Amino acid sequence: EAVPAFLARLERTAADRYRLWAEAVPEHAEGLLRCAAREDDIADRAEQIYPATAPEQVAAMEAAIGPAKDTYYEVFSTLTPIEQMAVQAKAERQGAAAWRAMIETESDPAIQSALEEMATIEEASADYLDALLPGLG
């Protein structure tokens, strides 16, 4: 449960990044803010399915999220917003694959369905970025 809950925290980091891009590229703010909302939605769903609220789980996630965020922002710091969004589109597809990989480990059809929905939501943001980027470059 801790890994999906940790992924939920990373989704929130991505949501924050989308909000920054909305400020940087205001003519596309509406679509980018929809992507941010999708990231928050995925995080909410993951936290509902995999709450990971045990103190040791929370402590481990708190210890790991800082370095993970630092790495995420460090990778992006040398890239233009357009390059960052191209990387993010790929990350969204990797996220979709991660949620789908968890389906095999679940026996509850409701959780399997929720994970598939989360993957589809990830792909919606990737599709948005893939459509947006050619017009920005």
Give the positions of each predicted feature.
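Non-heme di-metal
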Residues: E1-G137
